[in-house]
């Protein structure tokens, strides 16, 4: 049975890193980071761009769900509200698909420190810290399985996600890297 693994959480909690690790470990998997579907410069939030990102996400996820080469589809994005998750899931063809939804969370101080390091390395803007901390409490009300990642490595998070999704142990062995949405297909 195909599985869709949705991973939500505030910026900086480790969604992308953990999902990349999970993607690397699961055979026949596809990985989509919702941020790739809204990569605008300057970043613009309005009704049109909100509709665009949902269209982009749902189009790509449905293509992965229809593709026989994909057994596990991993999707991560901030998703701070149940309405956003519901809007995405309502537009997907989930017949015959096992759905597994998670939120990665951590204590505010842990999240602040992770983001501070990213800011110091030039990976994020300073304002992300307050925005991410403001989102943190919203994940308590999502109808998802929560995973506190404050003391976990990305590999440990990936292994726990796989376990909670019921992936057989043999499925969780490290696999060679493969192309994901947003990656170059030059040598594919």
Language model features with spans:
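Glycine-rich phosphate-binding loop used to anchor ATP phosphates in small-molecule kinases
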Residues: 52-96
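Conserved phosphate-donor/acceptor-positioning beta-strand/loop module used by diverse small-molecule
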Residues: 95-115
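P-loop (Walker A) phosphate-binding loop of NTP-binding proteins
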Residues: 10
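Conserved substrate/cofactor phosphate-moiety recognition/catalytic segment
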Residues: 16-62
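Pre-Walker A (Motif I) flank of P-loop NTPase domains
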Residues: 1-4, 69-70
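Hydrophobic anchor at the beta1->P-loop junction of P-loop NTPases
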Residues: 7
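ATP-binding Walker
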Residues: 13
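Small-molecule kinase domains that catalyze NTP-dependent phosphoryl transfer to phosphate-bearing small molecules
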Residues: 117-160, 167-188
